[in-house]
UniProtKB/Swiss-Prot annotation:
Function text: Aspartyl-tRNA synthetase with relaxed tRNA specificity since it is able to aspartylate not only its cognate tRNA(Asp) but also tRNA(Asn). Reaction proceeds in two steps: L-aspartate is first activated by ATP to form Asp-AMP and then transferred to the acceptor end of tRNA(Asp/Asn).
Bias-annotated ranges (Basic and acidic residues): 581-601
Annotated organism of origin: Corynebacterium diphtheriae (strain ATCC 700971 / NCTC 13129 / Biotype gravis)
Protein name, as recorded: Aspartate--tRNA(Asp/Asn) ligase
Gene (UniProt): aspS
Enzyme class: ligase
Amino acid sequence: MHVLRTHLAGDLGKETAGQTVTLTGWVSRRRDHGGVIFIDLRDSSGLVQVVFRENDVAEQAHHLRSEFCIKVTGEVEARPEGSENPNLASGAIEVNVTDLEILNEAAPLPFQIDDVSQGGEVGEETRLKYRYLDLRRPNQGAALRLRSQANKAARNVLDSHDFVEIETPTLTRSTPEGARDFLVPARLKPGSWYALPQSPQLFKQLLMVAGMERYYQIARCYRDEDFRADRQPEFTQLDIEMSFVDQDDVIALAEEIVSSLWKLIGYEIPTPIPRMTYADAMRLYGSDKPDLRFDIKIVECTDFFKNTTFRVFQNEYVGAVVMDGGASQPRRQLDAWQEWAKQRGAKGLAYILVGENGELTGPVSKNITDEERAGIAAHVGAKPGDCIFFAAGETKSSRALLGAARNEIAKKLDLIKEGDWAFTWVVDAPLFEPSSDATASGDVALGHSKWTAVHHAFTSPKPEWLDSFDENPGEATAYAYDIVCNGNEIGGGSIRIHRRDVQERVFKVMGITEDEAREKFGFLLDAFAFGAPPHGGIAFGWDRIVSLLGGFSSIRDVIAFPKSGGGVDPLTDAPAPIPLEQRRETGVDFKPKKKTDESAV
């Protein structure tokens, strides 16, 4: 239904020639050709060229500037032969304007908004400060429309399987889930605080106890994390939970959803999507989210060098990756690799160059034995002209360095082609990890022991570990699954714990006392006592998925009003101080009374 206009710009074509139309929109570009004025008029559907030839209306059009909001009436005409624009949907026609109304003028722009200038030269702070202008750019507006299409596609799949869309609270109590909470003061209960949810995890499990069986929600989530590249303090996930299912059931549904999303951009995902274990992902790719668009694998060399005299390789782990044709790199490039490794916390990146005649050169080749020199190229699959990069030391960090090196090699060799997609599931991750590893990576280690949950505290052990996970926490595997696309984790889930005794044992491994468990998670433990069904689910990182679908380099491009670095909103200048009166009213400075006896608060 159109009130001020009869058509959208994108609706006009040769079939509308001869019709009188009324359009509304913004002046995208203005060109003056000998008294005839051409305007590219933009609305939400696209662009159309409108022409001002008549004296009065042309005189009025002389006052138009970029981003004036206008209304025009005129006749649709075929463009003169040779002046068609094949790059424009409406490029075969133009509108000969007979009436012009300026709905609103525009001040001088902080940056240009047109089809040619798409934002690369404009600083991000400026773009976000004037986000309402930035979103007028075709690419930016298209990102939000793509997001809406993705929402619809996912809902269609879930609705076809009888899922129920349910909203869960955004004001709840603080229940640690692996990051810091955003807290909201409770004005009516001074000294008490709500927390914004890091995820709907506990509520969706309670919905399974409630018998809803199939739930989903496009949920807003909040995590008060130290700023990391391309993270947002508030983000969106497609949250799903199902009762009476196993891992295969959840994965099958997830693949149906992902397939429907990639069909939006014309790509058919081959299903079933391959699976690999977490152990294989770390061993072969040095990452639990491997990019499989190129076939470079890490080769284990620990056993090969088990009797080495080279002290650097006398370590718990030695591994290698091969750079095809890398022996031809100049010395400055090999030195640059060392700086690259040091920036990642390593001492360097050892290497061997395999000459065209098979002769080995480079620092490592001088320090290994003749037997090792004779066999290393064959062991790692290197041929004449290749470069072998090594990492040695602690297993996890060495593999991570080699994993990063394989990604860097792929970039330098241009192995990743536009339009390539590679999906995999990573399954059988550890149930627990050392708390020190979690904190070192910037996460919050839930609990007070040397072990914390890898995913979250509500992930079930795999069936074979159900009776013994607390006897050997470091070896226990989780009934969990992550989906990876082009080296990005786009979703993760697990089969959940549904028995109170198992949940209490997990808390115990993590050093959460009975009293603390009762205080923070008592409502969940109580619910498990009332016939909680087996259940599992998955959550998709919606911002990341839409950015991949649209080919955007940052999730900020697919969020209507994102935060910049450090969680700051340049548009509204949030976060901001609040007045003293508001501080008093909300009770943020309330100080609990000191305890005078056991019952005092």
